[in-house]
Amino acid sequence: MEFLLKLEDLLRKRKEELPEKSYTAELFRDGVDRILKKIGEEAGEVIIAAKNPNEKELIHEIADLIFHLEVLMVEKGISLTTIAKELEKRHS
């Protein structure tokens, strides 16, 4: 789980610096509509992968979805800590 926090920091850095040859920076440059489109695509791929017996494929697709959700969170200024607190509040 610690890696997700490191990824969040890296994503913030990409958003600030917008390096030329970065897929993540490209997502930030293109804006929220592009990020949402990617989340939709990845969510669909998770659904399809979940119907198949290949666990490795499902893990790959879930990782892609989580990555793009984190990109959206950074774009919108929402931290993983905020999400964790919301989940904790719901399940405590």
UniProtKB/Swiss-Prot annotation:
InterPro entries (UniProt xref): HisE, PRib-ATP_PPHydrolase-like
Entry keywords, A to Z: Amino-acid biosynthesis, ATP-binding, Cytoplasm, Histidine biosynthesis, Hydrolase, Nucleotide-binding
CDD domains: NTP-PPase_HisIE_like
Pfam families the record matches: PRA-PH (PF01503)
GO CC terms, sorted: cytoplasm
Catalytic activity: 1-(5-phospho-beta-D-ribosyl)-ATP + H2O = 1-(5-phospho-beta-D-ribosyl)-5'-AMP + diphosphate + H(+)
Subcellular location: Cytoplasm
Predominant cellular place of this UniProt entry's protein: cytoplasm
EC number: 3.6.1.31
One term of GO molecular function: phosphoribosyl-ATP diphosphatase activity
GO annotation terms (biological process): L-histidine biosynthetic process
Domain of life (superkingdom): Bacteria
Protein family according to the UniProt entry: Belongs to the PRA-PH family.
Annotated protein name in UniProt: Phosphoribosyl-ATP pyrophosphatase
Underlying gene: hisE
